[in-house]
Amino acid sequence: MTPDLVARFWLVELHVRLPAWLRGITSASASVAVKRPGSSKKPLEPAPQPAPYKPTHYRHIIYAYDVMEEKCEIPVLEHDPFDFLDPQKTLVPPENTILIDPVAVGLPWFSTMKGTPQCIHWREAEAAGLELIEQVMAARGAGAVIPEKLKTSDQRRKMMELVETAVTICIYLYAVSDAARIRVLTKSIVFLFLHDDVMESKANAEGNSILEGWDTDTFKANELEGESRNDIFLDFCREAIALDPVLGLELMQDTVRWARYSRVNSTKADKTHATWQDFRDFRELDIAYDFMITAVRFGAAILYDPAERPVFEWIEKLYIRHCLYINDLYSYEKEFREHQQEGAPLHNSVHMIEQVLSVPPGSAKAILRSVLWDCERQVREEYVRLMQLPELTHTQKVYLQRLIESFAGNYMYSMSTYRYARLSGKLIGPPPEDCLLKNYVQ
């Protein structure tokens, strides 16, 4: 059995658990004395067992961010249709992944989903992110505006933080991606972060970001032309479309559309929301709805006819809501601090609950956690309903599973990323030598 195949059984100490039935067989067989006819009565010593195989693909988790002030009992499910996420019940994880048990790793896990895949191509993702950010910094004089944070003396750490965040998003939310697709997805997230940081700072009045200046309505795969300052983005477009002419083009267009949306809404930093529904509708667009759905499909290489999308409309809506609730829960402390110190806008679910119900942040977080659990309940109900449809194709069923894996992956990203955990998280292990943030972790 090859090492890669053995790795798929993820017999990894600490972060992977053996199923109960397999542990029972192992312990029982080890205790049985082995005898041969005519041999002495002294039992033979069992042969030494090889050490558990540690897949070299595993990306170490350094931080654990416990966002809740009070512990809670996770709702118990009699039957879970998401057994494929449970490391106790799934011996073979999806292709290009290993399956991680968050509790065994040491994360303060409170999701009703039992585990999450991690993409084994994280080194390729890191290389792609670093390559892109170095290109952007080298081309600063070409006309595109870059974030203020990348102009400071602490520039290198900011660059590493941006890349680390993009990589952590991609290896958990789009875990089944192969090496080529994870490279494209990582670059797309870096582009979004660069643009978003420009929009949130005074630099947005200085000119266009690297994502602006495109007309997606007339943009075609064979018309990759633009101003010189967009050469870096053009290279990204060519890479994405060469890899996947259909989904690559969709991903690129959704990236540019969101950049245009955020430019328009950057002038509405003080926007208020009269109701929770009004706030949620705003945030669903603000979080790049179409891009996030396309990214899941791109990573999994799943095409479906636009006419099929209404079938998935509700579960995709729940996916976006779940993502924005998780994002708001874990980014609240960071965003609140930036709001106080820099005057940054504060459009956050925790803050909205505080205002609507006149409760302190801890209570608002507990309420949002309950909202998350209810969202997961609705997701399970819709997943079961869809999987029982006789007309659902195999490809459509695979897409649903990829979507659910991304649900769980967003928890893992949010709990362990340096972007959020550096302020309030705790170290759960020393950073390895190849860690991007080794020189900055404290």
Swiss-Prot record:
One of its GO terms (molecular function) is metal ion binding. The keyword Lyase applies. It is an enzyme of class 4 (lyase). (2E,6E)-farnesyl diphosphate binds at residues 419-420. Keywords: Lyase, Magnesium, Metal-binding. Pathway: Secondary metabolite biosynthesis. Its cofactor is Mg(2+). Binds 3 Mg(2+) ions per monomer. It catalyses: (2E,6E)-farnesyl diphosphate = dauca-4,7-diene + diphosphate. Belongs to the terpene synthase family. Terpene cyclase; part of the gene cluster that mediates the biosynthesis of aculenes, a unique type of norsesquiterpenes that contain a nordaucane skeleton linked to an L-proline moiety and are of mixed biosynthetic origin. The pathway begins with the synthesis of dauca-4,7-diene by the terpene cyclase aneC using farnesyl pyrophosphate (FPP) as substrate. Homodimer. This is Terpene cyclase aneC. It comes from Aspergillus aculeatus (strain ATCC 16872 / CBS 172.66 / WB 5094). The lineage of its organism: Eukaryota, Fungi, Dikarya, Ascomycota, Pezizomycotina. The gene is aneC.
